[in-house]
């Protein structure tokens, strides 16, 4: 903030709350906050196999007579080897994953269970890499672009792995 011209105004209650906060409460409450509309590809690595999903856009089809679809409205769908795949639940699973604790200062000590690389149409962050490593029987350590960030429930990682496996088989 030395060179910043922005003036930060905080009242005493906010300052005290910040000073008294436990470090864990300052960590993010999501594993990945992502605008999926910027994704140009999602690569999943399972058991040494790579699967590349790519988004495509089409005119939205009217589902029911009761639903009004705007003319020219588009929807995104995902392809794997030219075949459409329902990737929505996988994307939701990634963004809804909740950390169980911080992984600051930790290093992966077991094999990687899953690697997801998201290529993006974003010059500042053209690629985001999430790796999930078994940590304990209950936890997986998550790295974001190579840096350990949080611990997550291993059952959530297993469910994500299974969901991706169903899409690629």
Residue ranges and their predicted role:
Residues 1-169:
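Soluble, acidic/polar mature domains that operate outside membranes
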């Amino acid at each position: 903030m030395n060179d910043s011209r922005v003036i930060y105004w905080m009242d005493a209650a906010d300052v005290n709350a910040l000073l008294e906060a436990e470090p864990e409460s300052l960590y993010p409450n999501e594993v990945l906050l992502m605008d999926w509309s910027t994704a140009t590809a999602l690569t999943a690595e399972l058991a040494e196999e790579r699967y590349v999903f790519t988004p495509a856009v089409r005119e939205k089809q009217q589902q029911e007579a009761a639903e009004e679809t705007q003319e020219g409205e588009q929807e995104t769908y995902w392809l794997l080897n030219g075949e459409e795949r329902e990737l929505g639940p996988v994307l939701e699973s990634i963004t809804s994953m909740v950390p169980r604790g911080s992984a600051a200062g930790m290093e992966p000590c077991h094999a990687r269970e899953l690697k997801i690389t998201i290529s993006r149409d974003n010059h500042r962050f053209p690629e985001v890499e999430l790796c999930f490593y078994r940590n304990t029987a209950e936890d997986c350590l998550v790295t974001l672009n190579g840096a350990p960030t949080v611990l997550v429930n291993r059952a959530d990682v297993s469910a994500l792995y299974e969901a991706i496996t169903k899409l690629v088989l």
